Amino acid sequence: MAKEKFNRTKPHVNIGTIGHVDHGKTTLSAAISAVLSLKGLAEMKDYDNIDNAPEEKERGITIATSHIEYETENRHYAHVDCPGHADYVKNMITGAAQMDGAILVVSAADGPMPQTREHILLSRQVGVPHIVVFLNKQDMVDDQELLELVEMEVRELLSAYEFPGDDTPIIAGSALRALKKAKAGNVGEWGEKVLKLMAEVDAYIPTPKRDTEKTFLMPVEDVFSIAGRGTVVTGRIERGVVKVGDEVEIVGIRATQKTTVTGVEMFRKELEKGEAGDNVGVLLRGTKKEEVERGMVLCKPGSITPHKKFEGEIYVLSKEEGGRHTPFFTNYRPQFYVRTTDVTGSITLPEGVEMVMPGDNVKITVELISPVALELGTKFAIREGGRTVGAGVVSNIIE
């Protein structure tokens, strides 16, 4: 198939398959690409091709992930699939593969299993906003009532983790049959079910806001004083747009300050505006150099607030990944690296959890010694003497 076929004018959405081991996530990923390839919307990817996922490093954590891309009539998709359960945990916590939505694969023959629940919980914790369900292996279930029972169980499980279980689209089919048919060059009735699934994904998972459309936020990396012009803070704009004349707040570490942008520069040239992804210098009116430091953020007033206490979902690096060799306990005090700076904080483990071993994932409560701009979904690294020992994401703000 000619590469030029991918038309970048379609809206782009990131999705992935989640679910219990051996329920058919990778087979479904292969089936989607195979069925869509018959319509000239994807390149056929073989199961083995997806299953032998290359290992990637994200903040020192080894994650095996497969990326495939395909289109529907309406959208362009980047799709991630992970071979192992641990890879999903790491992927979702580090945000290595940000998902705008997920396809939860549940075997109709087995119903929801422990990792089904765990992946739904993780999706809730790390902020995967929407889930569509594929009941796989429908060909192995003769009893329609059993199928309905599994569907009911899945809806209840989704609702238990605050997803709209009753309104979630659930499509039954057989990924393996669809894949075999598509390889033989036919869509067939099983392929139609895969197309139906993708139509639901198109309709149910909203197109995400682009980074430039979000509220302005820039982590401060450095601060300079320019004679006769004032204070310049530099950094990479995380989201949104900033222009001369904008009111901004400086948040984190100390009391929040308000100021006005009097200039935006990139590579020593004046810009009308800076936008998400740009490395810029922002000139601030009446702000003194000593009032701003690395680790603060510049943002649209009122859009983010400083916090000291939060809950997070973390993955603790294994010894092999260069992490700790020993467990840690409540009152462990590492540094939390948020955006551009380290802040010391103490960890409280959940009731009933005595210790955390390298390689575990766990929910923790953190109290920082100074406030940092935080919101749901903010990513952080846990460090000890400059060495990363864990990665996490803010799942709840306490104060």
UniProtKB/Swiss-Prot annotation:
Transmembrane segments: none annotated. Keywords: Cytoplasm, Elongation factor, GTP-binding, Hydrolase, Magnesium, Metal-binding, Nucleotide-binding, Protein biosynthesis. Residues 10-209 form the tr-type G domain. It is found in: Cytoplasm. HAMAP family: EF_Tu_B (MF_00118_B). NCBIfam families: EF-Tu, PRK00049.1, PRK12735.1, PRK12736.1, small_GTP. This is Elongation factor Tu. It comes from Helicobacter pylori (strain P12).
